Amino acid sequence: MPDITIKERFSALSNLPRFFKLVWQTSPSLTLTNALLRIIRSALPVAILYVGKLIIDQIVLLSRGTGGDHYHLWQLVTIEFLLAILSDALSRATTLVDSLLGDLFSNHTSIQIMEHAATLDLDQFEDSEFYDKLERARQQTVGRTVLLSQVLSQVQDIITMAFLAAGLVVFNPWLLVLLFIAVLPAFAGESYFNDKNYSLTRRQTPERRELDYMRFLGASDETAKEVKIFNLSDFLTDRFRFLSDKFYKDNKQIAVKRSLWGTLFAILGSLGYYAAYVFIIFKTINGKLSIGDLTFLAGSFRQLRSLLEGILSRFTAVSQGAIYLKDFFDFFNIKSKIKPSVNPLPFPNPIKEGFTFENVGFRYANSERWANRHLNFTLYAGEKLALVGENGAGKTTLVKLLARLYEPTEGRILLDGHDLGEYDLEELRAQVGVIFQDYIRYQMTVSQNIAVGNIAEKGNESLIINSAKQSLADILVQRLPGKYEQALGKRFNNGVELSGGEWQKIALARAYMKNAQLLILDEPTAALDARAEYEVFQRFSELTKDKTAVLISHRFSTVRMADRILVLEKGQLIEVGSHEELLQKNGRYAELFYLQAKGYQ
């Protein structure tokens, strides 16, 4: 990625208003408190310097016996003491508010990312470029309040600098010119190296994700068995070491150059400061300035130099942060391609005709290969339909289209004569009970694991238990120490790990949590033994008596119970019929059936 130009840097500042709106939404009271604390703090350095000047002038007068007032001197000392205490207290208060606001902002934006991600399409999550944007957005949820602190510090320092500069201008305006000349190289250097860091960070995003993935694979309960059995530890650690060493070398190269140039720029800044200091000393020796003036001006120039360096370098940091904010907002600019209907139709209850696929095709973004193509069939109301085909035939993609997790690339899907897109999307999803073959093993309680099938009913204990009974999961739950409150998985304390078949029964219970009109089961018994599979499908036949159901399975003992069977190959429909009809056709279905049956002989 090319380095950031000055124009792009200033353009990135347009992200700040949107950022401040987010911060304000996080906590208006803390944001306002932060701003007020910094405004008050901005006047204190000048006040402390000026009181210090008055103290020194009083001491000089008293030591020479040419005037002065002891009482006034101690008043000034007391005032300076109180100002110093106030400055320290305000500094600590600002740090506290920054910390609290930072934690709240991180939580607030993390929740926003989760909420926005929930609105996006499934196929977007299957795109690597999307994951890069998601990863960069996640990185901005932590530490972005540093940007708020930087901007407010910028305002605070500008106000302080204005007070200090006024004193120098009255004395000699050329000192300000000297000051700017001294700090400009440091500003240019910071700007240059911040650009380099940003460009490097963006280039590293895909490899960063791979690094995190290697870290997960190398130390996870989900991968531990295969890592040991296949002796993958060296392979994973070698890859992790290669990537981390590469990051280290790239970052080190920039850090070393930045340090060397930074040292040179610091020397130039010191030369400017001491040139001004020598000038002020000569003026004091010649009697044109008092000792108090000397300390005030020298202190003002020193602080001005520090403030100006901070303001200029912080500008690069602020603009840099604003550029990173673009990554954050870019994620929120991603919108779902599945648009809800403006005037949605209510979902039919009950379904009268069924679902009709009219020349439906689907392919993933940036892919030339069609996952499904030329699909023409009807899933009738109350029908039990099975999908059969080899891996990659497009079976799971088809049911995702049916549940409107995907939008057809071509053609359309009708429900009772109306395009599926005309129905209320939330109502449609509420009427679909689905369990995919890659179901999630939630590291939660049994009750929560089942309730995710209809989270609105998470407090409905009787519904959860009934769903478990329908999937035959209740028998295994009763054997667990904590019953329905037993934590599952080994990620947290006191969790119990289940077998593959037991997890599948828990997952199957989720599909029964909804009184859905359409039930989709994708390899629902793949991990079950023969007896358990038979019992599950006996129960399944009873429970789906008046419902429409789609079943995906490689087991012909399972699919033969369906009213009709669709055979898919390379994403296209090649055969349709009942088990007996398809055997009589002696086509692809019959070939696969006899091939599997031969294995049992």
Locations of regions flagged by a protein language model:
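Juxtamembrane helix-loop junctions of ABC transporter transmembrane domains
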Residues: P2-T5, I48-G52, A84-E126, F130, ...
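Conserved catalytic Walker-motif region of ABC-type ATPase nucleotide-binding domains
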Residues: A117, F240, F357-N359
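ABC-type nucleotide-binding domain
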Residues: P340-S341, L345-Q601
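Loop segments that connect adjacent transmembrane helices in multi-pass transporters
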Residues: Y131-D132, T205-Q253, P346
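Transmembrane helix-loop-helix hairpins at lipid-water interfaces of multipass membrane proteins
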Residues: L32-L90, G167-N197, L271-V278, F282-G292, ...
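Cytosolic ends of transmembrane helices, especially the final helix of ABC transmembrane type-1 domains
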Residues: R203, L232, A276, L297-N333
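Membrane-integrated ABC transporters
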Residues: M1-P45, S63-L76, T94-D98, E115, ...
